[in-house]
């Protein structure tokens, strides 16, 4: 497991956890992952998350995955901007993910937010991932 792209590792952990119908997954700690988890929680894609620690300096998150009628709530989660090819957009040119049914998570100068909030605030940025 390479940590050259921790966001991709995090998204893959969610995808694999839901494919194997796990209720809880463990992901590494970072401020970016914390912000993404807060967005996923506020939009209703996960049931919750808690920050835990092992020893004095090893932190991680326990994420409760959400299911509806036995099927995962997140049907697709994908990394858009990658370390080798960054993807930026302005507030005017920001696309809608699945015609507004899904959401993009954007890293802006005002913090990490959903595409709806970025459009509302009038800021663009790097498109981190898409969730549907």
UniProtKB/Swiss-Prot annotation:
InterPro entries: Ribosomal_uS8, Ribosomal_uS8_CS, Ribosomal_uS8_sf
Matching Pfam families: Ribosomal_S8
Biological-process GO terms, alphabetical: translation
Gene Ontology CC: one annotated term: ribosome
Keyword terms of this UniProt record: Ribonucleoprotein, Ribosomal protein, RNA-binding, rRNA-binding
A GO MF term: rRNA binding
Subunit and interaction comment: Part of the 30S ribosomal subunit. Contacts proteins S5 and S12.
Family named by the database record: Belongs to the universal ribosomal protein uS8 family.
Physiological role: One of the primary rRNA binding proteins, it binds directly to 16S rRNA central domain where it helps coordinate assembly of the platform of the 30S subunit.
Protein name: Small ribosomal subunit protein uS8
Gene source species: Ehrlichia chaffeensis (strain ATCC CRL-10679 / Arkansas)
Gene that encodes the chain: rpsH
């Amino acid at each position: 497991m390479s940590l050259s792209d921790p966001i991709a590792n995090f998204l893959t952990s969610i995808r694999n956890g839901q494919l194997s119908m796990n209720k809880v997954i463990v992901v590494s700690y970072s401020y970016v992952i914390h912000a993404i988890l807060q967005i996923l929680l506020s939009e209703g894609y996960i049931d919750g998350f808690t920050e835990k620690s092992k020893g004095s300096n090893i932190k991680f998150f326990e994420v409760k995955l959400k299911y509806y009628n036995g099927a995962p709530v997140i049907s697709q989660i994908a990394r858009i901007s990658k370390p080798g090819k960054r993807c930026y957009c302005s507030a005017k040119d920001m696309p809608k993910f699945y015609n507004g049914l899904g959401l993009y998570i954007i890293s802006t100068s005002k913090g990490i937010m959903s595409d709806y909030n970025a459009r509302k605030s009038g800021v663009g940025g790097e498109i981190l991932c898409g969730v549907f």
